[in-house]
């Protein structure tokens, strides 16, 4: 948004383009047509420092930036910038009364570490004071800071005490202790089943609960299958914009209605005896005897690192581990993805039943395209699976609470949990867990908290996609809106703090009095480093809470050079409050 201020004198006309920072409240409330901000114009004696902003394609655009000149006369230089045809919340330039944080942001924008990079910053108090701003309306790739949005919407809409439900049911009939039919594990989206996460119910305990339902029903033998039913989530298990290399990793596993071990699989790998020899690879857990694996990966020269990638698909039980593993690397456990979570869950519960005196005549199966599939290598399908509503339910178990799942999502930056939350919103509020439906549901929940997402693009819940485009100003107004949510006290507890678990190295030079007031979430991928969050006020006044978003994109510098710059911004912001 640009306001032209014309100051006429008898000597000359000076034209200045000024973009004024919207407050945290104005970012949410003062919106005009097409999501543009309507901000009251004010002029004071503070120096004007401006930066590039996007404009409507129909308008001529100029940018003013400071140059050296006489102290008594502000001097500006105008130059053309590219314009955008789509409306967006436009970047505030600098705070009208410069803070230390603002001055530091301006200085690092010209640093070698951020050379030819995109830097976006916005920090406001909830009361409306702008503490730092730079390219705040620039849409950028958020990486894992996207999880702040996903967890916030889930906690707000589903409630912090929401729990996923997994049900055990059967088709057919029970007579003389024999189930003449199939046993169903009906997934409800619980992402923690058999997870190694500390919040998850241990697998043996969970399976014992499931078996107790059979015991109460008098089932001692199953003449049929144990079917893993993941139909609660429809559609592909990963987003179609994810990198093919990513979807083979554990962090790109993707979620479904019934999962197992976060749909991950561990492999033990070690270098071969010489450069060029095969890498030694063995499946660790879970064991998937129906899978066929090939390992066309080779031992590489010392210093080349770990370049192993698994390529797999949910359509066929075949996978390859390609790439290389340096000869000087120590043996390690690689975490890759398992595209058959529901089948794996059925397999392991089937084995549990057999080892505890309940034979299963036809073994495990899952459901694909509505049909029972017992042999993943065959194109042959059994008849259609029973409808869930037609099953006889024996019992149900519950996941940990949503606030605990959301906390692990943000602290561990768990993509699997984040995607599950994202798709749960679609399933619960738009009748489908497909990514398209989930996106619609997310937009609806966003409007419910008073935030428009018209000026950003959201395609997944974890931030793994490079097709997410979020601006610092959007993060700030979203985080500001969350402060008014009845679930905010639970939400802020999901966000990490410097010095605590997973953030031990953040703000390491800052005093403890500063660290204890900062809540932040990081996001990183190649060329991307972002941090967003809150700084609690030393005054204890809600209006003094600082909401910040600091984003860098297209950087060639390593995180070890970018992070200290971001840490310094956050420390200076906290010092001002």
Protein language model regions, located:
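Conserved serine DD-peptidase/penicillin-binding transpeptidase domain
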Residues: 89-110, 156-453, 542, 575-576
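A short, well-structured edge-of-sheet supersecondary motif
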Residues: 109-134, 365
